[in-house]
C-alpha cells in the first residue's frame, strides 16, 4: 500500500481530499501545519475529528517561527515598500510544501497531497509534468502554486481536480463530516481582523499620514499612511473630488500617493523580478502565453521578452490589472510554465 502525506487545514477541501485518497487505497497521513500561537485552535480540533473518523494518523507541526521569519516579514516589508505582496504564494513555496515533503520522506511516503483545486499532468509539448489549471477559473488554484519545482510536482496528488466545490460539500455531508458546511477561509490567514488592522498593529509608528497628489504633484488631500492602500484602489480613499479617481502610484520614499483616472492604470508591459520557470525560458520566448497578473484575473495574452538580463512580459493589449508586488503567472495550453513578481 502506497503512502501519502496530506496537508490538512481543518476545512472541507482537505478533509474530503483525505477521504478520497483513503478510498483510492492509499495509507493516508494527515499533517496540520500550525502557524498560530495557540496549540489547539478550532481548525486543529476539526482536523483531529476528521482524522479520527477516517481512521488515519494525524500530526500537528508547529511552523510559527518560520512563518514569522519568512511570510510575515515578507508581508510587512512588501507593504512598507509600497508593494501589494502575495503571502500565500511565498508560504506555499518556502514553507508548506517544503515541510510536507520533508515529512513525507520521514514516513517513507511516495506522495504528498493537498486540497488545492488544480492538477498535475504530463505535457507532451514540454516533455515533463506540470501544473494544469482546472475547468473552473473561479476555483482554480494553480496560480498560487506556480513556484513549485518540477521534481516536487511528480510526487504531488490533487484529489479535487475533477470536482466542484458543491460536489465536495455533498461528499462531506454524505460521509457525515462536521466540516461539510464550514465556511471557506477569507483573506490572509494571519490577519483575522483584516490586513489593514494587522499592518497598523505591526508597523505602528511607521504608518504616518501623507498626501494624495496628482501626477503633477498638486496636493489633493491627505491619506492615513501609504501602507494601507493598494494600486488600483478607488473605494475607501476618504476624499471627494469632482470625478472618480484611482491610486496609480504609491511613492513610499516620500509618503505620497498619486491619484489619477482609470485610464492611467493601463499598461502593455511589466518587468519581472524573482521569476521562476517550470519550463526552460528559451522554450517560452517565442510562444504566445496567457498571463494572469493577479489571482482573480482570467488572463491576457502576450509574449516574454528578455533585454539585458531583464525579463519583461509584453501584453497584446493594455490592461489595468498590474500592481507592484503581485505575482504574474504564465500558462500555455492550460499548463503553468512559470511566473514572477511584478516590479
From Swiss-Prot:
The active site is at residues 91, 189. The keyword Isomerase does not apply. GO terms for biological process: tRNA wobble position uridine thiolation. Residues 139-141 are annotated as: Interaction with tRNA. ATP binds at residues 7-14, 33, 115. The record marks 116, 326 as: Interaction with tRNA. Its EC number is 2.8.1.13. GO terms for cellular component: cytoplasm. The keyword Nucleotide-binding applies. Disulfide bonds join 91-189. Pfam families: tRNA_Me_trans (PF03054), tRNA_Me_trans_M (PF20259). HAMAP family: tRNA_thiouridyl_MnmA. PANTHER family: MITOCHONDRIAL TRNA-SPECIFIC 2-THIOURIDYLASE 1, TRNA 5-METHYLAMINOMETHYL-2-THIOURIDYLATE -METHYLTRANSFERASE. Catalyzes the 2-thiolation of uridine at the wobble position (U34) of tRNA, leading to the formation of s(2)U34. This is tRNA-specific 2-thiouridylase MnmA 2. It comes from Fusobacterium nucleatum subsp. nucleatum (strain ATCC 25586 / DSM 15643 / BCRC 10681 / CIP 101130 / JCM 8532 / KCTC 2640 / LMG 13131 / VPI 4355). The lineage of its organism: Bacteria, Fusobacteriati, Fusobacteriota, Fusobacteriia, Fusobacteriales. The gene is mnmA2.
